[in-house]
C-alpha cells in the first residue's frame, strides 16, 4: 500500500468531474438537510477514464493517503485546524510545496496453524 502527491492522474477534467459529481452534491445535500459539518471529510475514490467513483467517506484523514499531503503542506497545520474549527476556512491560505512526496506501507500477515 502507499500514496503519492501530487497525483498526475488528477488533471483539470478529472478534478472538475470530482467536484461536480461528488463534492458539490455532498455539500448541497448537507445544506438541504440543514446539516452543519465542520472538520475533515475524506473521500476515497477510484478513477477510471477520468470518471470518479466513491469507495468510502470518512470523517478523518485517510492513512496512508494523508502522509504525503502532510509532507507537502507549506503552511502551519495548526492554523488550518484552527480556522476550520472557527468556521473561517475561507480566511485561510493553504500553501503547498512543489515537491513530490510518497509514502509506502509494508504489511505482513502471519497465520499460525
Task: Show where each model-derived region lies.
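Internal nucleotide-binding/catalytic subdomain
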Residues: 1-67
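Conserved, structured core segments of small domains
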Residues: 73-74, 80-83, 96-97, 103
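Helical (often loop-to-helix) elements that flank the catalytic cores of nucleotide-handling enzymes
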Residues: 66-76
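Phosphate-binding site of ATP-dependent enzymes
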Residues: 40-53, 92-107
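Conserved small/polar residues in nucleotide/adenosyl-binding loops
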Residues: 111-113
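Oxyanion-binding "anion nests"
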Residues: 26, 38, 81-89
Amino acid at each position: 500500500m502507499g500514496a503519492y502527491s501530487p497525483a498526475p492522474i488528477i488533471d483539470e477534467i478529472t478534478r472538475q468531474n470530482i467536484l461536480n459529481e461528488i463534492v458539490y452534491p455532498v455539500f448541497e445535500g448537507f445544506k438541504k438537510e440543514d446539516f452543519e459539518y465542520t472538520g475533515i471529510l475524506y473521500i476515497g475514490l477510484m478513477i477510471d477514464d477520468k470518471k470518479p467513483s466513491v469507495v468510502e467517506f470518512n470523517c478523518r484523514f485517510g492513512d496512508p493517503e494523508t502522509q504525503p499531503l502532510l509532507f507537502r503542506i507549506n503552511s502551519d497545520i495548526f492554523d488550518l485546524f484552527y480556522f476550520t474549527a472557527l468556521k473561517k476556512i475561507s480566511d485561510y491560505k493553504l500553501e503547498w510545496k512543489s515537491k513530490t512526496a510518497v509514502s509506502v506501507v509494508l504489511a505482513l500477515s502471519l497465520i499460525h496453524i
